[in-house]
């Protein structure tokens, strides 16, 4: 089975040891292509300290390690790349900071124009969403499945779908044209206490 999950961390990680244990557990599923560290309201030094431990696991399980918002941290950690929102720095500026051939992903909400612009500027992938209601992140943008069909037809680079995607609705998203599905709460806040069980449910 190919790797199709784009796993995003919880916004707050209080116990690093427990989290790292859970993270290694979900990596054994062998369906996670990307892991994005997305911690809010935390000092850069603490994010870097955690990132140094995470990268040992991502290398071990051949998962691309992506840092949210901050290419400087990505460079310090020697991560595979970073993910930028529309309010963050430009792709071209991020490219100057990161090592050559780094992955740079861009949030494009539900916009064909933003996606076209991102790929013109040599983005590695674009992320569309939210496709379903989500508690992970407040969003004022709603994306339709037809957007994925359009993107698949018009672009050769990867398309990531995000927003309320879970084990029950992921097939619709993949069938519509997404290369990867981004998930966070469906794993970390799952009713299933074992996050590996939650990840493996995506295989069915």
How would you name each of these model-derived features?
Residues 65-81, 94, 110-124, 154-155, ...:
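Catalytic cores of alpha/beta
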Residues 8-12, 40, 70-72, 87, ...:
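Active-site beta-loop-alpha junctions enriched in small/polar residues
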Residues 32, 77-86, 106-155, 190-195:
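Glycine/Thr-rich beta-alpha phosphate-binding loop at enzyme active sites
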Residues 48-67, 93-111, 139-167, 200-204:
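Alpha-helix-loop-beta-strand connector modules within alpha/beta enzyme cores
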Residues 23-35, 121:
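Catalytic domains of carbohydrate-active enzymes, especially glycoside hydrolases
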Residues 7, 12, 84-94, 127-139, ...:
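Glycine-rich phosphate-binding active-site loops on the catalytic face of alpha/beta enzymes
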Residues 23-24, 51, 71, 91, ...:
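Generic hydrophobic/aromatic pocket-lining and core-packing "Φ" positions
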Residues 2-20, 103-110, 160-161, 165:
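Active-site mouth loops of central-metabolism enzymes
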């Amino acid at each position: 089975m190919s790797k199709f999950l784009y796993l995003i961390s919880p916004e707050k990680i209080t116990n690093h040891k427990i989290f790292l244990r859970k993270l290694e557990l979900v990596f054994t599923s062998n369906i996670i292509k990307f892991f994005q560290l997305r911690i809010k309201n935390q000092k850069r030094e603490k994010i870097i300290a955690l990132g140094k431990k995470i990268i040992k696991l991502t290398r071990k399980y051949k998962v691309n390690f992506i840092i949210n918002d901050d290419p400087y941290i990505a460079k310090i950690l020697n991560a595979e790349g970073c993910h930028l929102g529309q309010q963050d720095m430009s792709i071209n500026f991020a490219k100057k900071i990161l090592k050559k051939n780094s992955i740079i992903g861009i949030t494009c909400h539900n916009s064909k124009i933003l996606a076209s612009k991102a790929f013109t500027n040599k983005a590695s992938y674009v992320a569309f969403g939210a496709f379903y209601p989500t508690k992970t992140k407040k969003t004022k943008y709603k994306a339709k499945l037809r957007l994925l069909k359009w993107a698949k037809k018009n672009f050769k680079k990867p398309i990531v779908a995000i927003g309320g995607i879970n084990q029950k609705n992921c097939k619709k998203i993949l069938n519509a044209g997404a290369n990867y599905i981004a998930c966070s709460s469906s794993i970390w806040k799952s009713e299933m206490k074992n996050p590996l069980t939650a990840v493996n449910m995506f295989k069915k």
